[in-house]
From Swiss-Prot:
Gene Ontology molecular function: any one: identical protein binding
Annotated organism of origin: Bos taurus
The protein's name in its UniProt record: 4-aminobutyrate aminotransferase, mitochondrial
Range annotated as the organelle transit peptide: 1-28
Cofactor: pyridoxal 5'-phosphate; [2Fe-2S] cluster
Length: 500
């Protein structure tokens, strides 16, 4: 299958990136490099509206078993390749959402198909071990080749998990254990502590808190949900904790026209963070840590300046609490750096860093001082999946070999420049264009218009995603090139020209 996919290369010529800088211009390209076309399709192919009849039937069948209202459509992953997702009705779409930002190097990459066909790797895909107690011989080697090969500065400790939520959940637990250990000192666990914690009683189930930000999304498990504030439907009916919630900067765009206003907004938010830490300490709900996304993704692609994050990092250091950076959606290279918070240019940017999605497995890095002092404190049955570490090692090799971080920065510039042009031509539909690398977005007037634009684009052969109240977000793969950006921009320009 891998050789077949490699053989199915594009016969047509793409054109390289340049654009006509006049209103109503098209985005044009020249011959793309061979690496661009090794396994990608040559374009869209639409046979029906989406969802089509076959998809609608499958949705009905699923809805008998579970609530299927969130389902967009059913996919044919055997036929999906590169940047193109094929559905069960045969529609081939340019996928700029990539499974909620979780596909690193495109669908059915030949390098990964070749990897899983190698006989020595078969047992890793067939047998899923309990990684806390019974590990495969090559587990440490594969960690070094995968996650540890891209470890953030100052991070030598790593625990793998299955998803972003469990990465954050256990990252928060690690912070609580670290904080309590500081208070307790080096002594062990007295019998009184062991007994009272079993019935959820203080002080041995301490009433600590985690400070999070309005608009944040860190997951849907109980602890994570207490730090998630993006959509009410995620939280309603679920008991939660009295933990502090700080405002996240709401920047005005274009940034160069609102420098003073944005500086004041960021200063206001930083001041509120400090005030909340003091307030909750007085309430006997001590803030053990702060959790933040480098870009609030689910909450609306909310950005803040690098200077804001550098100053935010100083607050937990001063207040003697921990700092957790959640790069679940912004990690893996989409911003032009492997980890989004590398843009802050700090030697000590975090105490704990959680990741998942494009990394193909969950997990979190942490400093040595946050290492659990006993077994089973951070634990579950699977603790990730060694087959994903194997795949990730090859993904990282491909990212380095094909220089995909620079590609994300370059293709992202083409996308962002085109979006700014569309904003100038259609200000009634597009505002607040923003982005880093290919991690781009813009606002629409309201959620109704946003949702209509997404549906129209899908029926034109482009998969987009929404976020926040009225934003459209772009989450393409790392093999998204300039010519893919120009293809989208031409399609979306036509959509906006006809939109009513």
């Amino acid at each position: 299958m891998a050789s077949m996919l490699v053989a199915q290369r594009l016969a047509c010529s793409f054109q390289h990136s340049y654009r006509l800088l006049v209103p109503g211009s098209r985005h044009i390209s020249q011959a793309a490099a061979k690496v661009d076309v090794e396994f990608d399709y040559d374009g869209r192919l639409m046979k029906t509206e989406v969802p089509g009849l076959r998809c609608q039937e499958l949705m009905k069948q699923l809805n008998i078993i579970q609530n299927a209202e969130a389902v967009h459509f059913f996919c044919n992953y055997e036929e999906s390749r590169g940047n193109y997702l094929v559905d069960v009705d045969g529609n081939r779409m340019l996928d700029l959402y990539s499974q909620i930002s979780s596909v690193p190097i495109g669908y059915s990459h030949p390098g990964l198909l070749k990897l899983i066909q190698q006989p020595q790797n078969a047992s890793m895909f067939v047998n899923r071990p309990a990684l806390g107690i019974l590990l495969p011989e090559n587990f440490v080697e594969k960690l070094r080749q995968s996650l540890l090969s891209v470890a953030p500065k100052g991070m030598s400790q790593l625990i793998t998990m299955a998803c972003g939520s469990c990465s954050n959940e256990n990252g928060l637990k690690t912070i609580f254990m670290w904080y309590r250990s500081k208070e307790r000192g080096q002594r062990g666990f007295p019998q009184e502590e062991l007994e009272t914690c079993m019935i959820n009683q203080a002080p041995w189930c301490p009433d600590y808190s985690i400070l999070s930000f309005m608009g944040a999304f860190h997951g849907r498990t109980m602890g994570c949900l207490a730090t998630t504030h993006s959509k009410a439907i995620h939280k309603i009916d679920i008991p939660s904790f009295d933990w502090p919630i700080a405002p996240f900067p709401r920047l005005k765009y274009p940034l160069e026209e609102f420098v003073k206003e944005n500086q004041q907004e960021e200063a206001r938010c930083l001041e509120e963070v400090e005030d909340l830490i003091v307030k909750y300490r007085k309430k006997k709900k001590t803030v053990a840590g702060i959790i933040v996304e480098p870009i609030q993704s689910e909450g609306g692609d909310n950005h803040a300046s690098d200077d804001f994050f550098r100053k935010l990092r100083d607050i937990p250091r001063k207040q003697c609490c921990a700092f957790l950076v959640d790069v679940v959606q912004t990690g893996g290279g989409c911003t032009g750096k492997f980890w989004a918070h590398e843009h802050w240019a700090r030697d000590d940017p975090e105490d704990v860093m959680t990741s998942s999605k494009k990394m193909m497995t969950g997990g979190f890095f942490h400093k040595e001082e946050f290492r659990p002092n006993a077994p089973y404190r951070i634990f579950n049955t699977w603790l990730g999946d060694p087959s994903k570490n194997l795949l990730l090692a090859e993904v990282i090799n491909i990212i380095k070999r094909e220089d995909l971080l620079n590609n994300a920065a370059h293709a992202g510039k083409a996308l962002l420049t085109g979006l700014l042009d569309l904003q100038a031509r259609y200000p009634q539909f597009i505002s607040r264009v923003r982005g880093r690398g290919t991690f781009c977005s813009f606002d629409t007037p309201d959620d109704s218009i946003r949702n209509k634009l997404i549906l129209i684009a899908r029926n034109k052969g482009v998969v987009l995603g929404g976020c926040g109240d009225k934003s459209i977000r772009f989450r393409p793969t790392l093999v998204f090139r300039d010519h893919h950006a120009h293809l989208f921009l031409n399609i979306f320009s036509d959509i906006l020209a006809d939109f009513k």
